[in-house]
């Protein structure tokens, strides 16, 4: 015991301690979960880098690519020098409140150089240089949590997955042609510029397409590059020299040419004349080699064998210059005769055998009608710009701009690297245009594929798909803005007097600022952040979307793109993806994955050296990984880190195989590296079916933060990581001592990282009842007490859905799996009333209501309490400014903000005249446009914000809010000042105590030794007047004083800045004079119709809330909280929920045992049994807390935490096994079956058989019945059709559709039907008449013509069909009249 206490370790109760079931040690830490966003944007802005030393990346690269800009005449040039950011005008919190964008002003330093141009020689001399900083709009900044604040709302820029630039080879899988023949194609995809496709057709002719236009023969493209026919042939084919030998031809023998060939005629040695192989024999590789080894140098062939070959060079009469045969011509009988006539002794033939080498290029050349570079260029020009007549210059310039101009074409570094790798080229990644060699290499490789050599690419491999994160997306967007600006600058440079202007005069930054604003405001990838809970925030930031500009579309994406690919392992989660049309197109990054500088996703692996697994970790992309043999993280190792099995299951080149252990060179880092954050939070994920796991990981993101968060008993160990990285829980920036704590802020006196230039105080403002994007409640609660010592990174406050620094999305509830009177039929959920009474699943939702007073044509609107025709009762909660008080309880129809709007003059009725005479002007010329609570909404007002335009007088309420805010700022300043004083004067006291002072304040006698008593006689401010003998110490004291004065000034300056911001008027949209926002909090208890779910995809709707006494109960009288249907488990195959139930039961049982021992300790003071129980529960290993080193107090704190239920962690794929669960149940003295006898709450009788009971973690999802239930009597109508609107948001009605009409027809309910189709829908006159009849107490009314009929008539008239309505009765009367007159 003494030994245990000797090496004590403290436990402060501020974190949740879990028993770990994982056996695999973590060799590397998980990277920060929002690093993807932060790193990418930091790399784009490079704020920290010095102005002159920034590398050419991100924003710097954009400016470098657009500048310098010269004018059209070349007399002036605008150069880019550098850029810098000023401090943002408002901080994050102020931007949120004022609906502003959190951004910093961007200042670009530009240099304008003016030249003197000599008209004769054209030489330039510098005449003038002007440098100036130019404001280029605001650049949005990222918050510490990886989000952007745009117009006051938090947004996330989702990373995009797109096909990597480079070259790709593929075939059509035999689908294009009826013969089923594979047509091969290559595609060169640049990052920016024209796509080049090279493809075979069914006749094996090779064509090129530029930007998917009309195809042209590939030889035309090669001619346009400056090659002629013989160049093309000599590039793609070898020559074989045939020499005439008597009546035949002699050709050199090569193994490559003859191997695998079936001989048509005898093979004759040209030197000896003997037959070395007979006709009909197939030469194997071995036989062909054997002939060469025997000394066969050349063979003789007959004239007939020459037929079908192709000439490599022209056959020319050198005297006359006549060409008898051209290069590429096929040798037929006629050609043989010509060869005989011109007595050619030696000819060069193309090495084409139609087996190993095909005649595709030669055939394409023969099909191609173009014969020169000019023809080819003209042909390409006509394809790209049809209808324009080409000239040689324009055609050449246009062709050059397609692939060879860095302005128009950019492969990017990635594209060049991929191209080099694929085709074994050696070209630096700074060359980002296409070269002639690249195009030739692509054609050669395509021909090789057609000849059966090489492999096609898999476009779904993650080596061929890359991620574009925030920084890169923003870079592309900003480049577009700058290019728009470039045109305007060029024009302006030519039109102004260049000698007198400054850079500022040439630049209009609007296009660049507009591009940024457009991207953040309306891009498909800039999304409203999902802020339901911390997990949904983190997942949103780690999302990878294949949609968006330059990506796929839902309709065109096939099955292959959406499917899970072997390379996803450890990079993209195979589980978490939405159900529905986006399945597989929106993915989530795996837990350990990161994105490298080229945009490829990398996963970490442990290195294996000499058969021993090391702790060295390397990150590899999918391309690099395919070369290695990778073992799984759970492969069994011995104590030295060597594999125990002879053969190890591993992955290699996309396949899973058993490899000998000495082949294996890498190993996974962790079993959870293949899943995403949300999937890694599901315990026993390995026991759930994949479809249900998908639902589980998606539904955790919809869990509403509850009033009382509770971490799960059965966790996975990921909970604390998510809470920390999401920023929901507040962690300490520096170590220190807690100085003050209240509900709204924590003040910590720093003891580490003390930088003289920074304050020695950290003030953490906690968010209290703030509204999230999804209207859930963000509320932070302090965990520390005054005097507590905290270390850097410690959790000091819990946020929404966090409990002691662990993610807590739901609650642990006692579940019984059994049917109960049909109330859990079809996944319904039966709940106990205790859940409602104890607010177990109660959540707070905050709704925001906004009202603006505008300046209208008829006069300004006014926010006031003086509203016409409103009873005083309705105004009881409004203050004198007409704004509701904080704390007021409101219900549907209540006025939140009183507002009146002037209305136009209209003729007055006698009543109005009377009112006007009595009450004066006000009563008649305004109407009530107050903001009222919408139907179905109840709650309490928690916050009011008032915004005024500059120069508009503030009302009393605005002044009160302002005063409150300034008091809060002053309190912060005073607290920081007092801690600063305390620290500085403590240091000064240390410096002066015991020293002899040679000078001092008035009344001090020199030469005395200073101590606390002497110094206590003088006010602290006079201590600085003491001067000591030691000069070095005196200079230190003076430095301290200077630093103190500077800190005080900086503090006061900061305070004054903030006060000035508070007092300054607000920037308002045009026409708005004043704006009021009211926040109403609603407490939502759980009720029938709400959706709930577990973590395993086990979702359901609450069907009934049963009184506690009627719920099934255990032997000790404990009632179940929730009853689930056992039939929901087998068919869904999510057995994880059952294992969680058993383990949760064991946790609660163990907690009860510990609780009993805590009570024993409190009674007797004997802690030994408690210590023994906890030490047995938490054996010493790498994962568990070192409880053996805890002192008694720490152990007691831990036991108090555990008595509600022991928290455990069972990591995915490395969690508790059946045996572990059995052991836990036995330790807690529970039946190892996990089943108990339950009693019926209504009869008290035991149920027939034991029931599975335990604790399961249930979530309340954001699909609440209160948000969905809706009823309407009268409401708005559509303007055109005059029919009622639909949907809750529009306060619409239920549609009486076609089928419902049939039902009424079937019943013969003619009058009801007529009513439905006219007066209850779109008969405008009829509706009014019905209302009047009801008012009169009448029940007679007449239906008129539905408005939709009039719409139909109007539509027919628009098609020039005149339709007129005639009164039937009149027509009949006329007809009767005419009949009678005829008679």
Swiss-Prot record:
EC number annotated for this UniProt entry: 2.7.7.6
Enzyme kind, highest EC tier: transferase
Upper taxonomic lineage: Bacteria, Pseudomonadati, Pseudomonadota, Alphaproteobacteria, Hyphomicrobiales
Positions of transmembrane segments: none
UniProt feature coiled coil, ranges: none
An annotated GO cellular component: DNA-directed RNA polymerase complex
Gene: rpoB
Name of the protein described by the UniProt record: DNA-directed RNA polymerase subunit beta
CDD domains listed in its UniProt record: RNA_pol_B_RPB2
Family from the record: Belongs to the RNA polymerase beta chain family.
């Amino acid at each position: 015991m003494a030994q245990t206490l000797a090496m004590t370790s403290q436990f402060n109760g501020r974190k949740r301690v879990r028993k770990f079931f994982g056996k695999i040690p973590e060799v590397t830490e998980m990277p920060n979960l929002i690093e993807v966003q932060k790193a990418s944007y930091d790399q784009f802005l490079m704020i920290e880098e010095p102005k002159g030393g920034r590398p050419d990346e991100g924003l710097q690269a954009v400016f470098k690519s657009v500048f310098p800009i010269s004018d059209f005449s070349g007399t002036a040039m605008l150069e880019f020098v550098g850029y810098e950011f000023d401090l943002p005008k408002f901080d994050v919190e102020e931007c949120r409140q004022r609906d502003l964008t959190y951004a910093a002003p961007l200042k670009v330093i530009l240099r304008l150089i003016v030249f003197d141009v000599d008209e004769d020689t054209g030489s330039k001399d510098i005449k003038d240089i002007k440098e100036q900083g130019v404001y280029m709009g605001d650049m949005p900044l990222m918050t510490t949590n990886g989000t952007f604040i745009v117009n006051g709302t938090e947004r996330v820029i989702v990373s995009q997955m797109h096909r990597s630039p480079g070259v790709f080879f593929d075939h059509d899988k035999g689908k294009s042609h009826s013969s089923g023949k594979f047509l091969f194609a290559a595609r060169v995809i640049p990052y920016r510029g024209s796509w080049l496709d090279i493809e075979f057709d069914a006749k094996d002719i090779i064509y090129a397409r530029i930007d998917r236009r009309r195809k042209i023969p590939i030889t035309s493209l090669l001619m346009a590059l400056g090659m002629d026919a013989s160049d093309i042939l000599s590039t793609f084919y070898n020559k074989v020299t045939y020499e005439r030998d008597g009546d035949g031809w002699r050709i050199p023998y090569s193994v490559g040419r003859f191997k695998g060939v079936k001989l048509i005629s005898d093979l004759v040695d040209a030197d000896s004349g003997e037959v070395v192989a007979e006709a009909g024999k197939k030469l194997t590789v071995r036989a062909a080699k054997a002939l060469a080894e025997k000394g066969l140098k050349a063979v003789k062939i007959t004239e007939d064998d020459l037929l079908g070959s192709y000439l490599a060079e022209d056959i020319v009469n050198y005297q006359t210059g006549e060409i008898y045969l051209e290069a590429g011509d096929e040798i037929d009988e006629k050609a043989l005769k010509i060869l005989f006539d011109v007595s050619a002794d030696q000819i060069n033939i193309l090495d084409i055998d139609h087996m190993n080498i095909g005649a595709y290029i030669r055939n394409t050349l023969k099909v191609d009608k173009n014969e020169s570079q000019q023809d080819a260029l003209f042909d390409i020009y006509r394809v790209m710009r049809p209808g324009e007549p080409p000239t040689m210059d324009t055609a050449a310039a246009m062709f050059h701009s397609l692939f060879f101009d860095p302005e128009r074409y950019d492969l990017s570094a990635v594209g060049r690297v991929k191209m080099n790798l694929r085709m074994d080229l050696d070209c630096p990644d700074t060359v980002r245009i296409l070269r002639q060699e690249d195009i030739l290499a692509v054609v050669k490789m395509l021909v090789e594929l057609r000849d059966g050599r090489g492999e096609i690419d898999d476009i779904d491999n993650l080596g061929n798909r890359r991620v574009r994160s925030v920084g890169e997306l923003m870079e592309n967007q900003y480049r577009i803005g700058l290019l728009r600006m470039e045109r305007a600058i060029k024009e302006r440079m030519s039109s102004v007097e260049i000698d007198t202007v400054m850079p500022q005069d040439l630049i209009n930054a609007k296009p660049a600022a507009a591009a940024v604003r457009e991207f953040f405001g309306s891009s498909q990838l800039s999304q409203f952040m999902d802020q339901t809970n911390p997990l949904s925030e983190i997942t949103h930031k780690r999302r990878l979307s294949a949609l968006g500009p330059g990506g796929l579309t839902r309709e065109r994406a096939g099955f292959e793109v959406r499917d899970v690919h072997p390379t996803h392992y450890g990079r993209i989660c195979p589980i978490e993806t939405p159900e529905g049309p986006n399945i597989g197109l929106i993915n989530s990054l795996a837990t350990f994955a990161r994105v490298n500088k080229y945009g490829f996703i990398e996963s970490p692996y442990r290195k294996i050296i000499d058969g021993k697994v090391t702790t060295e970790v390397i990150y590899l992309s999918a391309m690099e990984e395919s070369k290695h043999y990778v073992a799984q993280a759970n492969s069994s190792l011995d104590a030295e880190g060597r594999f125990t099995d002879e053969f190890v299951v591993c992955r290699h080149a996309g396949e899973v195989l058993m490899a000998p252990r000495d082949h294996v060179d890498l190993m996974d880092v962790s079993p959870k590296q293949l899943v995403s954050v949300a999937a890694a939070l599901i315990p026993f994920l390995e026991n759930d079916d994949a479809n249900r796991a998908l639902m589980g990981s998606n539904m955790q993101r919809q869990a509403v933060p509850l009033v009382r968060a509770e971490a799960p008993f059965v966790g996975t160990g990921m909970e604390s990581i998510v809470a920390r990285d999401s920023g929901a829980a507040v962690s300490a920036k520096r170590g220190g001592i807690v100085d003050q704590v209240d509900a709204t802020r924590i003040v910590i006196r720093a003891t580490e990282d003390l930088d003289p230039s920074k304050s020695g105080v950290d003030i953490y403002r906690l968010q209290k009842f703030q509204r999230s994007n999804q209207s859930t409640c963000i509320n932070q609660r302090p965990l520390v007490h005054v005097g507590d010592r905290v270390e850097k990174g410690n959790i000091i406050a819990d946020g929404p859905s966090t409990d002691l620094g662990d993610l807590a999305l739901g609650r642990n509830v006692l579940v019984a799996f059994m049917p109960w009177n049909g109330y859990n039929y079809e996944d319904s959920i039966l709940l106990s009333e205790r859940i409602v009474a104890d607010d177990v699943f109660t959540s707070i939702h905050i709704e925001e209501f906004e009202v603006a007073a505008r300046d209208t044509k008829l006069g300004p609107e006014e926010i006031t309490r003086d509203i016409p025709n409103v009873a005083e009762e309705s105004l009881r909660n409004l203050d004198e400014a007409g704004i509701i008080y904080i704390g007021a309880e409101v219900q549907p129809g209540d006025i939140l903000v009183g507002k009146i709007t002037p209305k136009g003059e209209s003729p007055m009725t006698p009543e109005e005249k009377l009112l006007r005479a009595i009450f004066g002007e006000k009563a008649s010329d305004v109407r009530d446009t107050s903001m009222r609570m919408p139907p179905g909404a109840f709650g309490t007002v928690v916050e009011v914000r008032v915004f005024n335009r500059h120069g508009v007088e503030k009302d009393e309420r605005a002044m009160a809010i302002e005063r409150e805010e300034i008091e809060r700022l002053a309190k912060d300043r005073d607290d920081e000042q007092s801690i600063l004083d305390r620290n500085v004067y403590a240091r000064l006291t240390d410096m002066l105590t015991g020293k002899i002072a040679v000078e001092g304040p008035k009344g001090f006698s020199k030469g005395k030794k200073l101590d606390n008593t002497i110094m206590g006689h003088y006010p602290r401010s006079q201590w600085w007047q003491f001067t000591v003998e030691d000069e070095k110490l005196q200079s230190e004291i003076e430095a301290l004083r200077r630093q103190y004065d500077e800190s005080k000034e900086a503090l006061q300056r900061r305070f004054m800045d903030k006060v000035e911001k508070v007092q300054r008027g607000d920037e308002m949209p045009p026409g708005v004079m004043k704006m009021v926002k009211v926040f109403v909090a609603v407490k939502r208890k759980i009720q029938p119709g709400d959706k709930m779910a577990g973590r395993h995809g086990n979702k359901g709707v609450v069907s009934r809330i049963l009184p506690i006494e009627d719920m099934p109960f255990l032997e000790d009288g404990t009632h179940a909280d929730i009853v689930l249907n056992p039939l929901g488990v087998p068919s869904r195959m999510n057995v994880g929920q059952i294992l969680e139930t058993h383990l949760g039961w064991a946790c609660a049982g163990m907690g009860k045992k510990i609780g009993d021992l805590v009570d024993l300790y409190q009674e007797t003071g004997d802690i030994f049994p408690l210590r023994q129980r906890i030490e047995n529960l938490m054996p010493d290993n790498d994962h568990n807390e070192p409880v053996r080193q805890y002192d008694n107090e720490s152990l007691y704190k831990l036991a108090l935490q555990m008595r509600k239920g022991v928290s455990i962690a069972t990591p995915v794929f490395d969690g508790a096994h059946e045996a572990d669960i059995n052991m836990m149940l036995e330790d807690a003295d529970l039946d190892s079956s996990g089943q108990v006898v339950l009693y019926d709450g209504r009869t008290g009788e035991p149920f027939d058989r034991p029931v599975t009971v335990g604790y399961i973690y249930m979530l309340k999802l954001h699909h609440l019945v209160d948000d969905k239930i809706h009823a309407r009597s009268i409401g708005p109508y559509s303007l055109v059709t005059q029919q009622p609107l639909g949907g809750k948001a529009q306060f619409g009605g239920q549609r009486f559709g076609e089928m419902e009409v049939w039902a009424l027809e079937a019943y013969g309910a003619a009058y009801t039907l007529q009513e439905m189709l006219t007066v209850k829908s779109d008969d405008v006159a009829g509706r009014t008449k019905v209302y009047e009849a009801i008012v009169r107490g009448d029940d007679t009314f007449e239906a008129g013509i539905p408005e939709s009929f009039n719409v139909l008539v109007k539509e027919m008239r628009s098609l020039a069909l005149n339709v007129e309505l005639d009164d039937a009765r009149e027509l009949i009367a006329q007809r009767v009249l005419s009949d009678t007159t005829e008679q």
